[in-house]
Amino acid sequence: MGCLRSLVRRKQFDSSNGKAETHHHHQQLAKALTFPHLIAIGVGSTIGAGVYILVGTVAREHSGPALALSFLIAGISAALSAFCYAELSSRFPSAGSAYHYSYICIGEGVAWLIGWALILEYTIGGSTVARGISPNLAMIFGGEDCLPTILARHQIPGLDIVVDPCAAVLVFIVTGLCCLGVKESTFAQGIVTTANVFVMIFVIVAGSYLCFKTGWVGYELPTGYFPYGVDGMLTGSATVFFAYIGFDTVASMAEEVKNPRRDLPLGIGISLLLCCLLYMMVSVVIVGLVPYYAMDPDTPISSAFSSHGIQWAAYLINLGAVMALCSALMGSILPQPRILMAMARDGLLPSYFSYVNQRTQVPINGTITTGVCAAILAFFMDVSQLAGMVSVGTLVAFTMVAISLLIVRYVVPPDEVPLPSSLQENSSSHVGTSIRSKQPLLGKVDDSVVDKENAPGSWVLNKKNRRKFAGWSIMFTCIGNFLLSYAASSFLLPGLLRYSLCGVGGLFLLVGLIVLICIDQDDARHSFGHSGGFICPFVPLLPIVCILINMYLLVNLGAATWVRVSVWLFLGVVVYIFYGRRNSSLVNAVYVSTAHLQEIRRTSGHSLA
């Protein structure tokens, strides 16, 4: 029972000062970031070199001339998660992002798995990006043989291992920049992001000129705008959705933002909007230059310009790809130390990772550890086969953020904070309740489901049962979303079983959604966390649709990816059982209301005097 209880204990949030409460005080990160910094982080982390390749592959195999629509639909889908992140990041502006929100709203067990999955995401993501830089860099200098010998790829004799010194060196350079300070590293990211955006603008402007000159030949086809049908366009949307992953990095930097309530939602939203516009305009131009079936799947943009006699554009486009990869690499190295620091502050990881350098005010130990691990992977391993694992961490985090938003709106945790151990012994009369006596998110609904008001014929849910109904409804919608996603993706299932799963899943989803729409949201949401920030619209519909999309993408990642992820998650469970659970800052935590804490502090101050 003790182990199960530890999985559902939740970190409390002190609404009075906007910080997650633990038993210990930690060094804070520098409040140095403003709105332009967040735009640089968001756009730089999102627009990787994938756009220089994806447009060819998706247009040839799925979308055809409707490629821009695929990017638009994928952008709208990503925006659903962005709305959820925008509200929670402005409510709880602290390091940790999805891990932090899950710990406050759902529980320690889920938060640990989210944090553990994000560690995997950023490490493998950074290594994958770094391995992709050297081939593009070599193309700028004239080919693979033109890089200096010390940086060129080599195969270890007798082993099927190709080492990439250039990738490791670049990881160490980026790690060094991140150690200098968040403002310095963000400035550097802004420079390379700006260079990449200028290359994309060149593609749009020069490509549009060529398209008007040649008559947009890519759209004058007998197959029409949807050669693969609407299904092909939607399949293309699912593929290019992963080109929008990266805006969540902005939320990871929340503790270092000067005005988080205003700048975080703007940074997340405008970054995603800019990326969507750039993706769509590049897609429109490239499809107009070359018919979709004639696109080069490996180098679609440079090949499109070469087919019109502009050979030199290939060098500029390769430079843009290198800039995009460098910016994405920094977008992988920056957030992970903040995740490690947040988990170490909560006692789930060793305190080594919570150390913040006093001069640079960055989590230096976590940054160095992240850089070393990513450099080793990038040097020795071809991690391209592990790239799907990055998507698992991201999509699970997106899903839990949407669930956390539903909990914040409908089942707000009690306004309590942990009582410092120094005050526990002399203040037993003031102590409210321990973590063991906290009401669970789900519970048995009492027989007196409604309270009768004075007006005849009017009935309302009492507060206690409203919370329980909301908790069960959230769970029903999650189960329904999973069943629908699984049934829609399992083409090998017998038809009757598949349709039955769809029916049951749809029923669960519909019942949960109707209940959430009909009952009132929790009034305590207005004072939970920072108030006055961004408010996500269309709740509960928006987060529920967000959960459905993310679960569908998760189910379709493939069995091999899930096997690899399961091994990593199993290792995480072992670490949690033998270290995190025992060293958590919530072990034996005693909670009191915020008002009682102030009274206890005053009483203790008088007694000391």
Curated annotation (Swiss-Prot):
For this UniProt record, the keywords arranged alphabetically read as follows: Amino-acid transport, Membrane, Mitochondrion, Transit peptide, Transmembrane, Transmembrane helix, Transport
User: Where would you find the membrane-spanning parts of this chain?
Assistant: 38-58, 66-86, 104-124, 161-181, 190-210, 226-246, 270-290, 314-334, 361-381, 388-408, 474-494, 499-519, 534-554, 558-578
Protein's cellular compartments: Mitochondrion membrane
For this record, the Gene Ontology CC terms, alphabetical, are: endoplasmic reticulum; mitochondrial membrane; nuclear envelope
Instruction: Report where it is expressed, by tissue.
Output: Expressed in roots, stems, flowers, and leaves.
An MF annotation (GO) of this entry:
transmembrane transporter activity
Topology within the bilayer: Multi-pass membrane protein
- Transit peptide location: 1-14
Q: Taking the first listed entry, what is the main subcellular location of this protein, grouped into a coarse class? A: mitochondrion
Q: Which residues form a coiled coil?
A: none
State the superkingdom: Eukaryota
What are its GO biological-process terms?
amino acid transport
What is the similarity comment for this entry? Answer: Belongs to the amino acid-polyamine-organocation (APC) superfamily. Cationic amino acid transporter (CAT) (TC 2.A.3.3) family.
Checking PANTHER family in the record gives: CATIONIC AMINO ACID TRANSPORTER 3, MITOCHONDRIAL, INNER MEMBRANE TRANSPORTER YGJI-RELATED
State the protein's purpose.
Permease involved in the transport of the cationic neutral or acidic amino acids.
Q: What is this protein called?
A: Cationic amino acid transporter 3, mitochondrial
